[in-house]
Amino acid sequence: MGKVARRLCLGLLFGGMSCVGNEAGAVIKLPSLVGDRMVLQRGTDLKIWGWADPGEKVTVRFRGAHYYTEADGQGRWHVLLPPQQPGGPFLMEVNEKVIRDVLVGDVFLCGGQSNQENPIERLVEKFPEIPVSNNHMIRHFKVPYQDDVRGVKENLAGSGVWHSATASEVMNWTSLAYFFATEVYNRYKVPVGMLVSSKGGTDIESWISQEHLKDFPKLRVDREALEAVAEAKRDKGTGKWNRRDFDDSAWDSVDVPGTWRETGIRVRGSVWYRKNFRLPSSMVGRHAKLYMGRMSDCDSVFVNGTFVGTTAYFGPPRKYDVPAGVLVEGVNNVTLKLTALNGNGEIVRDKVYKLKGDDDEVELSGVWKYKVGFDRAEAEPYEQRLANLRHAGSGLYNGMIYPVRNWKVKAAIWYQGENNAGRAGEYAPLLTSLIADWRETWGWPEMPFLLVQLPNYMAKQDKPSDSGWARLREAQFQVSRNVPHTALAVTYDAGEWNDIHPLDKKTVARRLFLGARKIVYGEKVAASGPIYKGMETKGNRIILSFDDAGRGLSCRGGRLKHFAIAGEDRKFVWADAVIKGGKVVVSSPEVEHPVAVRYAWSNNPEEANLCNKDGLLASPFRTDNW
């Protein structure tokens, strides 16, 4: 094979790398992380790596120093740069390739699911400072999606890009990363890089290597069962029910918006909705905007048979463009295919459902026609053989964590748990494994981890009851107490009852930054609210004591809320709670002989208000182990 052909093959093999050179010169290949506007971690040895022809000599020039190496027999090479002082921008040269606008500062690895991935463009109305951001000293790199359970990947998929936080680039950021980077920069005045490796709707085990999942049983993949399940999930409406002229007169009717359960739809699969309507003449043939609120989980939307948009998971606002020429005189049609494999299909109330033109609009809420496309119950006999397939794990670690292992970081930020709330009992050991795994991958046993506790979500409960989200928060808290060099941001006041992706990422970032100031930067600062220590019973009262009360216990508002108390019957009722002598005294006239207390123990405990005098909320807790 000729030299040019060899280089072409290497270029195809290592997709996502940048190349420089020509037929007569050497081709140096770099991972997409090594590019313009990159941020390198200060104060530690730095690895710059890539690929070239075997035996090719490589010279890296940076800040007046030269580093030499040679590609090995597999074409791999790397150099180690000594610890660097913060600053920039600088140039880096790798042979003939020039990397511009390089900064040296602090880099944070951001992992998790959709709230870590939440795009900043959704927040511009709430935080008008975002579109006019002008900070070129903080940078953002979004790791391209890559999921592969077969084994680790040496390089990222596609080509990631570093973006600054200037007005022309800030919309490429994720929201939590932006606010956290801003906090760090404003205090320490060093460049900040946010390396975001996240994917919406993912389980924690997807982010853990196979080696660190050895204590969690796995099922073998059953190919026959996979094929049978695929056939059972084939949607009867595909290619037919979205047509404008389809006859839906035999379909049932339903009010939109609303939930499947309240309208009697008992399906774990897809439901097709259709609505016919007439237009104002001003909208015929013109471009329009279709507003379809929010839905659970996945929607595909058609107007007069033309596909106009899809969103793959619950949360994002559904706003779709309807091209000119689609809307016609007479009867028009909107068709919605809504898929919810867990049976919790929902078209969320109090959102906008309209078709808007330049001058007129059509209200779309009201009566629609509907029919079931498929119900995964038909696949259940086969799915039992694939019970653990969805939780097989490691695919995202292999594709989105392992390839960035050489990039030195200051700390990791983990925001995930929504997907695991239904299996909260195993979350603490999984999160412990993830932290140990990433620390081993980076070769840093004391790598700091900043954890986000799940915020409040879903409707408030009238009576105390158990909660998967509360148990998940408990698991996150336990890990933060049991695993060294971790800090927890309590956020049950920063969510939204009807949106799993709350907009207030600034509050979350500020609380994460308090933890960073303490465990990353070594400041003596209060970073935690009161932490339950113990209890004693006196008559019909339970007296609670706390650690980390700082300058003393306090509460937001006039009185403590969201305490529940129970006797031996384990039936919790809302309780009265008061702060006395640095402790909390809990009681209820309904419980004569109390044995247990719970605080902020619900999906949505937003009214819970126990804090210290620094204003930091207590983490939810319980005194029982029921």
Each predicted region: which residue ranges?
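C-terminal beta-sandwich/jelly-roll accessory domains of carbohydrate-active enzymes
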Residues: 66, 549-626
